[in-house]
Amino acid sequence: MNKTKGFTKYKKMRYMPGLDGLRAIAVLGIIIYHLNKQWLTGGFLGVDTFFVISGYLITSLLLKEYDDTGIIKLKSFWIRRLKRLLPAVIVLLMVVGTATLLLKSDNIIRVKHDIIAAIFYVSNWWYIAKDVNYFEQFSFMPLKHLWSLAIEEQFYIFFPVILVTLLLTIKKRYKIGFIFWGVSIISLGLMMFIYSINGDHSRVYFGTDTRLQTLLLGVILAFLWPPFKLKNDPPKVVKYVIDSIGSLSFIVLILLFFIINDETNWIYDGGFYLISILTLFIIASVVHPSTWIAKIFSNPVLVFIGKRSYSLYLWHFAVISFVHSYYVDGQIPVYVYFIDISLTIIFAELSYRFIETPFRKEGIKALNWRSSYIPQFIRMVIVVTLLIPFMLILVGAFNKYGKDIIGEKANSFDTTIEDNYSMRIAPIDNIHIDGLVSEKKKESSDVYNNIKPLLIGDSVMVDIGESFKSSVPKSRIDGKVGRQLYQTLPLVKANYSQYKKSSDQVVLELGTNGDFTVKQLDDLLNQFGKAKIYLVNTRVPRIYEANVNRLLADAAKRKSNVTLIDWYKRSQGHSEYFAPDGVHLEYKGVLALKDEILKALKKK
């Protein structure tokens, strides 16, 4: 290269509206998924689309700067990234923190911790440490979506340094591309290995090391298909091939958005990698200056949405988290979704116009009191109403209003020695006083000493454990949060093998946390021999609900000693039975489910 390092002028890379169009598709998929998982079960794949785009675009920018000037100014790159990303995030954190304090003060400690993690762009590792499940929506976590921004920011910090080092030490770029491809394979292998050991979704889904594969595929494409070297008018056959491959890949990707769900395990065994390769083909076609698919993705509507994709991504999940927290999940009225969408659009547009654009163009100068972007009065209101409480939240001034919500909830309910139960203290939140009469006392009026059932279940069983034990003192109850049916077989073999006689009664409440197979269900049922088995079906706003209930109903039809307890039917239309997550039970729900189980047990 005949150039003087550091002095040749850097020519800005051409704008590629097709990428904005692809961003629009990705963010719309994510928003629809978070509004209601069952509308677009694989919408979360939009995050991977963003990862591939980021890897491709950032690498292309850095390579072009290196080709034009002979150097890459790392400091300038990092400043541009901060100007682009940080201001909007800080405003989001201030708004969410203040809103949590005003509307959801019980959650202020948890949200404060999430805010601190987000400020330092380590949200993904924070959620791994706290064993948070991305696909589980039982908890109020309005900042959980920032895990992906944390991964991208970590990538922006370390990748340019590695790229510069490789460019200076390795002259053949195809060798550099092979190095990144090798690292992507290592990342893929790490995801497969960790997942195979313990099936831990959280670790492999949130981990920078396991998600690096997707970003690096974008990096590799930048080496193979740099946008600044593409010909404006290639042969027609070349354009036809590019359009055909890109179109077919896009169709397959959209189909996967509808087919894949959060219970699809093969995505952790190479699925994310293959899906990202599809995205590579789409990117290659939409960034080409002469393809018709690029023109389709460059239409004004998609470009408009794509330019605001960052703001839409930032705000949609926070809005949905707050709004949906006032409704029972799975029983949300249609008009609520219009509220979600309207508020998301409003906040995103305000952020784009008054935060993103000014700071991207002017940097810190956007805070100048004489700036035309934000009038002085509005600026003062923002500082007073958001910044001050935000700082107080960070220093823990409002911790007294928060609660250790996770610590307050029982993780298990296990009664194995009947005599010990008389010493157990009923939880205060199970006692409701209306006037001077305790509902707990009313509930305990009927006691059944003539039955000795075994009850095994998940968190719903934990919910009813105290109440059921008070009514059936000789019952044996084993409930654990997060328990799945396939995990129960070893438990039964180890602890409950004696429940095999025709006089025994066994209640199984499983299926809240995931699907299972016919074989897994039959293996469990066969452990109880001739015992009378009662299967409680589930009400859970998840994609697997229908299949779980179908398998349980089929088992009751196939086996003469199995009876179905239809909790799904009993709870239909009774939102008062449920906590906001639509699964766990409020007091009335506890009584209703206990009643259903007792009715079935008393019949035999």
Curated annotation (Swiss-Prot):
Coiled coil regions, renumbered to chain: none
What residues form the membrane-spanning segments? 15-35, 43-63, 85-105, 150-170, 176-196, 212-232, 240-260, 267-287, 310-330, 332-352, 377-397
Q: What is its EC number?
A: 2.3.1.-
Molecular function in Gene Ontology: acyltransferase activity, transferring groups other than amino-acyl groups
Q: Principal localization?
A: membrane
**SUPFAM superfamilies listed in its UniProt record:** SGNH hydrolase
Report the domain of life of the source organism.
Bacteria
> Record's family?
Belongs to the acyltransferase 3 family.
Q: Which GO terms describe its biological process?
A: lipopolysaccharide biosynthetic process
- What is the official name of this protein in its record? Putative O-acetyltransferase SAR0937
All disulfide bonds of the chain are none
Where is it localised? Cell membrane
GO terms under cellular component: plasma membrane
Which controlled-vocabulary keywords does the entry list? Acyltransferase, Cell membrane, Membrane, Transferase, Transmembrane, Transmembrane helix
State the active site.
S459, D581, H584
The record describes its membrane topology as: Multi-pass membrane protein
